[in-house]
């Protein structure tokens, strides 16, 4: 079955309530520790050169143009409403790579770069597709157009890289599979044309989103004349049997059989007629005298903008698809040209592949622990989370006589989802038959996961779909599973991740604080498609959410917490430098004062009252379901309010005889297993305070300064001339 034939808007999910026990062996020693070695090694070797890094980003980022054009043009072809008003589709480059960029561009002090570089390394290439709209029904409708194109793009990509990899393995190092002349880019994007594009695009989106616009459009379509410069106002509309009769102010009349039955149901009062005439005025000014000349100008001088406007032009002006083949050809050339740049840059070489396989082996040999995975058919109960026999156990084979080694391994493309009409709802679609796999050497394979919907505690809904390309590797005779040596153990490297956040997820409407990340390539012509990403201030909020408010309020009980707290504190330092605030100093001063109070209980205690607008309401804790509601912090502390609350609340809880009851009260609302004792809480909290203090001292903010931010911020403003009563085209 072809996955692009699925009705993605109809796929349902089984909601899972996540009950977490932080002591569970699969969290402390997860199986993915073994698997992630391949990704870390792939990134280290393949993206060692910045050119490869930026060329790969340039290649994947074309997905933004691809999705926006094909989603809208397919909506037009299906007689569905185009993206309108505040609807938008954006592809964001996200994750550790973007933090790495901010670190490298904003931190100039060599000492800091050396101290913190390990926490801001290059990572796998993560992208998110934001499908922004207002209702579930519309979101599901847009999914049916967006998802097939995501899959198409990833399949095209995997095919290109598989063919290229096979050439490298076969020794065809001088063979270039793709040759595209960059001359096609000479009028790809006009300098300083973005504002003109945003203005006309947002205006047109507002017009087609107006109530009853479809009525006026059908009247215009039935009145259309190639010589018409402006459409006449309507005087009267009547139902005449099967026909709608429209009389204009110049007494001309048209009759037509409407495509929409609601034409017959509407009462054509003077108010409605005036409403229609207002829309006609908008059409005359912003379509006939706005969109048309702007589109034709872009068609000659800025193909990128013309391509994005073309679906609106086709819908409103010229339904015959004059330029569709041209834009499809343009997008195809962009993909192939961008890929050819990677070939020329020697993205893969035999030496790189061999080095990667060897380094993965070396890293596996260094693993000494046992790693765990839950058995989905027989998961451990609450009493077994520390019992190794209740889990699937993995260890590394140290016996060289078994010839443990790493191999490239072709495998199937697949998609997993739920089909609740079946007795076993879990459905897996394989895109390819076995013969295709053997023929194409499908080492880069595409996967899709539409099962993920978790509820974390009583507040956080985690709902997203995930599409990936992975670079498939297997560890041969390398891994024991429950003491049995496996012939093959899959350790695929991440290659490209594309996630789509679903409309009911808690983070669906988060402020992305978009900025345009520059691609730094000297003497290389590339299509100028903006790389939409996140500002460093976005990551401050994201790290605070992960560390303090996501499902567990104790940061030190979460994975990778040391790395994340160091990232957060350094980003706060950068924020303070840019905005003349003192958030980092505030957290440092709180940590040192609380640490003093903890270690000197018999001495006069440091007063912490100045940091809060209220006392910590521990005596009435049962009245609250959220730990962070126990104390109020002044809004002047902006992004650090949650860390401040946690510091104040935990320092107070430690003095209470009923501390365990208080903590478990709030864990209950987060669906977390109750703690049986907190004898180590004071020690763990003290170590957390030490982490803040030592990181602050490493930064030593009094003696260094950050570079000025060079990020190009992009506002999510609506540039519509209807909303703003202006003309900019």
Swiss-Prot record:
Q: Which UniProt keywords apply?
A: Virion
Gene Ontology CC:
virion component
Q: Where in the cell is it found?
A: Virion
Q: Quote the Pfam families the UniProt record gives.
A: DUF5851 (PF19169)
Q: Which InterPro entries match?
A: DUF5851
Q: What is its main location?
A: virion
Q: Which family does it belong to?
A: Belongs to the mimivirus L515/L516 family.
Name under which the protein is recorded: Uncharacterized protein L515
